[in-house]
Amino acid sequence: MPKRTFQPNNRRRARKHGFRARMRTRAGRAIIGARRSKGRASLSA
C-alpha cells in the first residue's frame, strides 16, 4: 500500500502558502485581495 501523500510540516506550509509567499507574485496578491474583499477571517496559511 502506498504511503499517505499528506505529511504535515508547518515550515513547508508557510513557505508554499503563507502570506509572504502570496505577496511575492502578482497572482498571489490578487488572491489576498479577493480574500480581503470577501471578508475572510484568515487570509493565508
From Swiss-Prot:
Keywords: Ribonucleoprotein, Ribosomal protein. One of its GO terms (biological process) is translation. One of its GO terms (cellular component) is ribonucleoprotein complex. One of its GO terms (molecular function) is structural constituent of ribosome. InterPro entries: Ribosomal_bL34, Ribosomal_bL34_CS. Belongs to the bacterial ribosomal protein bL34 family. This is Large ribosomal subunit protein bL34. It comes from Kocuria rhizophila (strain ATCC 9341 / DSM 348 / NBRC 103217 / DC2201).
